[in-house]
Regions:
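Proline/glycine-anchored alpha-helix kink/cap motifs
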Residues: 17, 48, 99, 126-127, ...
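Feature responds to low-complexity, polar/acidic, surface-exposed segments characteristic
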Residues: 21-42, 55-117, 123-149, 162-174, ...
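Short glycine/proline-rich, acidic loop/turn segments that cap or connect secondary-structure elements
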Residues: 151-159
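Disulfide-stabilized extracellular recognition modules
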Residues: 175-176, 183
């Protein structure tokens, strides 16, 4: 709390305080205060930040449990493709134009949170819509995958990009930044 108690002895005393800077301590190699080394997504966060695909939400925070927007994913994929994402009237404008031109996204709703099935669909399109031969029937919520996303989800499952959680794909759930980092890392490793 920054308070100190001093009891004056009976004789004359000289006190000389010494102050030293304490370096910021980071709980993980990522450099983000909110990403513990033991977190299931720590390696993925390190990977995507090292590759310049994702940044922190500020200098010390990654915000792993925050939602990811469609514009964020368009930007990440454009960066992965080597595109310059700087400039434009908005931070995502150049990425959105790239995503539309490449058929990755229709460019709508860039500020909307992205669902897991939308995430996988954009990545599937980025990959060139490869053959989708994965089975979804082992997931209890497979029927909740939207028809437009079925092939993409089958591909993502077969490729090991998406593992699901507790036997569910959660396709309608918003994708957190940690989930996006993990899926991106798997995608990049698969694409090598």
């Amino acid at each position: 709390d920054g308070k100190y108690t001093f009891t004056m002895p009976d004789s004359k005393v000289t006190i000389t305080p010494t102050f030293s800077k304490i370096e910021d301590t980071k709980p993980s190699k990522t450099g983000f205060n909110d990403v513990a080394s033991s977190a299931w997504y720590a390696d993925a966060v390190q990977y995507v930040t090292d590759k310049g695909l994702m940044n922190g939400t500020d200098d010390n925070q990654f915000s792993p449990n925050a939602s990811t927007t469609r514009g964020m994913l368009m930007t990440v994929l454009a960066r992965y493709a080597g595109e310059d994402t700087t400039g434009g009237a908005t931070w995502y404008e150049k990425s959105m134009e790239w995503a539309k031109a490449k058929g990755v996204s229709d460019g709508t709703n860039p500020n909307a949170d992205i669902t897991r099935e939308q995430l996988v669909t954009m990545m599937y399109r980025y990959a060139g819509s490869p053959k989708a031969d994965g089975k979804l029937d082992s997931f209890s919520d497979a029927a909740s995958v939207s028809s437009y996303a079925v092939n993409a989800m089958q591909w993502a499952v077969a490729s090991g990009i998406v593992n699901g959680s507790n036997g569910k794909l959660n396709p309608q759930n918003n994708a957190t930044r940690a989930q996006v980092a993990a899926i991106l890392m798997r995608f990049c490793e698969m694409s090598k």
